């Protein structure tokens, strides 16, 4: 997972260098996915994460942006990351039983200041 995390961060930095801040999250997601393909990092997009309630799987609309090798990636393009963004990725990680998550905010001048790593 550490190797995958490094590749994801490297790919995100490449996207940010090319595009800079200020675009839509969907643009950064498309470009990051393209970079992951170029770096041979297998991933899935918008995978449904069910909630198990009283033994029943329910689709409640939880869909992380990207999951690559059990690393959850949530992409933002906001003025500043808020607690709700952290809660969102932590919820995905708990429901999907993933141990590692990256919250990446592309709306910063230096991307390294927009990356938060979460471990459960």
Q: Which residues are covered by each model-predicted region?
A:
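Nucleic-acid nuclease catalytic cores
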Residues: 76-120
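Conserved catalytic cores of phosphodiester-cleaving nucleases, focusing on short active-site segments
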Residues: 20, 64-81, 92
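A short acidic/basic microdomain associated with nuclease active sites
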Residues: 37-53
């Amino acid at each position: 997972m550490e190797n995958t995390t490094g590749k994801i961060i490297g790919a995100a930095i490449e996207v940010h260098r090319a595009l800079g801040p200020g675009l839509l999250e969907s643009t950064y997601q498309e470009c990051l996915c393209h970079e992951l393909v170029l770096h041979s990092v297998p991933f899935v997009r918008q995978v449904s994460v069910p909630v198990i309630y009283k033994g029943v799987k329910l689709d409640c609309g939880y869909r992380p942006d990207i999951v690559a090798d059990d690393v959850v990636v949530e992409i933002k393009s906001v003025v500043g990351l808020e607690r709700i963004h952290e809660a969102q990725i932590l919820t995905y990680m708990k429901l999907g039983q993933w141990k590692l998550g990256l919250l990446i905010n592309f709306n910063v001048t230096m991307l390294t200041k927009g990356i938060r790593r979460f471990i459960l």
